[in-house]
């Protein structure tokens, strides 16, 4: 059997480094390429569509390999990281010319999904958050950081659901955990397709001390330690741009879980998963990348503190009413680059000359921005922002004096530093540019000094520069200055101290100039690094101004109005409100506004009307108006008086939960239960067609029970749309419920949607008319109409509005009889002939007959219906 080929020293070095990074692709620098070997090469060639070749092809065991050019490596790294992989970048860390034996190589950075900072990897207005989780004393410490900007937030979370909602909201791609986090939590995180990286060891460092100095809770300090330790291990450099950790409480903001944010399409379009057609798309007239990122954060976390909301409103109103100042501000903001990420590049040492010119350009526009805000700040509205508008003139002046206006991308190829900044560098540059002139001047000078007219200065690769004198003139040379260098047949070649100095200067000028320029550049970079906190503070102020001017611009263009918000009562009064995204897509002339009025004596609007008439749009319209108001923007209405809401819960649309494998109905019940268990009087509930995922009467019973529970126990403002017209009679027993419907009329057999909300219940659903609009065959529609008439004549089920939780004990027997009759009616409706039931079905039927639906809580009903469905679906 042939023996395996002995590894070369280079491959031994590769294997030693690879052992340290078993879970990452190792990009091993070899000349002008990054090479991958063995399994990395096989897998990498497939993912990156590279040619798989072999090293030592003639050996018994050739090594699979593939590679990418070093100058194009970032694109390939981005692809791997975007697919959830890690990439270890291994560089030559010594000059091959000076290496004794094998060139030393080290991993200089581990790029992961949560730490990628290259701009090409994502949009400028997107954050890339790395999160961390640590469990201690029955609490979860949770932290997240954007490595490109230095933003660092920390909190204490008490439930797994809250953790999952935060992870989804942050769109995190990677989370750092330690052994304190149990498998149940890890499995639920894995279901979100998030890369889990384990970091058990921690270290105290200057970065940890700085980041946690305002943090008091020990579990928060500990999670910061794990997070920063992981960053230092992966990035292998100082993290001087990390900001002080800011503690936040999810309860400080309007709470919306993942389902609510998804259903309301705040940041992502449900259909396309893109920005277009979302609230973010509507409100984004920001001019800077950092403003765009901050806008997303504000939309994701609306305020609940009235004073904070009013402070934003005042600034928006000020900007809105001063058009010329706002226009001037926008013109300045357009010229401000991404200060946050420029600061990050400075800290990482990846900043180049062009980045510094962007920084200088940005800083040069701050004085005018400051002047505009000062003009608007007579009443002190902008005091907090104004104080942070620091032009950082010392840094702007430094860059202006030192860096060329159009520098190259590379920081090692020269042409970075302006003439006059460094005398030594100027001499090198002069030597490069004027070497021939110097030599000509020296030649003339030596001829004059020696009286030798045919004396000449020459150059060859072996001896360098020399002075050549014919043998007949040797006696004219001074003895002390000329040193013999080479003897020819008819001449001698010499060098003088001055020529030797010029030779050294000329020959080394280019390389020395590049070295000196890089040294000067790194010195400038280090000076700027000392001012990173000032740059970050300025960036925050500019970003806030950008979002506020965006609100003012959108409010002006959309004719939005300043809402009156209060914590004194629970009344809601919106006149001629509209869904701003739909209106922008359709055009103002095509969209019909609607009022929403719910005073302290009205908690539930029961909405009926045809499909496609606008019930869901009306509900989303209210929720979006609340979000827009509580981020400090004006709202789409003619007038609006609103309370401050603490939470928004939605149950809109039908979608199976593919991650957990649960049905539409089960998802519906779970989402509904989250609302029922967590809502307060100050919450907003939006329920669309609750109960449609199960049998008709089961659904109707659930819907009625949920409405009554909300009305009698929670007292939250609730919009509940339904096709169960039988429920409209509930307004007789529930004094804080009102029926409304979306108007529609039949004309010449056609259905016309009025899209106007009207008082009272709808007379019917017009389902067959909607099917006609969808283009279903006439024959099918006629058959459906015939069946509908038959069903309506045979069934006369109505809700007994006198039944309520307060009277349940007196009507248990009646409920049992009605439940039995309803079940029999359902069986006769869909199975007119006798049906033979197995023992399991008979058992369930008996349970259904005996179930006291009106004596159960909504959650009890959900659980028992789910149990029945599960048992009936079992294959016997």
UniProtKB/Swiss-Prot annotation:
Q: What are the recorded GO MF terms, alphabetically?
A: ATP binding; ATP-dependent DNA damage sensor activity; damaged DNA binding; mismatched DNA binding
Which sites bind ATP? 609-616
| Cellular component annotations (GO), alphabetically ordered | cytosol
Protein origin, superkingdom: Bacteria
Q: Which residue windows does the record flag with biased composition (Basic and acidic residues)?
A: 806-817
Biological-process GO terms, alphabetical: mismatch repair
Give yes or no: UniProt keyword ATP-binding.
yes
Where is the stretch described as Disordered? 801-825
Report if keyword Chaperone is assigned: no
Keywords recorded for this protein, A-Z: ATP-binding, DNA damage, DNA repair, DNA-binding, Nucleotide-binding
Q: Where is the signal peptide?
A: none
Known function: This protein is involved in the repair of mismatches in DNA. It is possible that it carries out the mismatch recognition step. This protein has a weak ATPase activity.
> What does the sequence similarity comment in the record state about its family?
Belongs to the DNA mismatch repair MutS family.
Q: Matching PANTHER family, A to Z? A: DNA MISMATCH REPAIR PROTEIN MSH1, MITOCHONDRIAL (PTHR11361:SF34), DNA MISMATCH REPAIR PROTEIN MUTS FAMILY MEMBER (PTHR11361)
This one is known as: DNA mismatch repair protein MutS
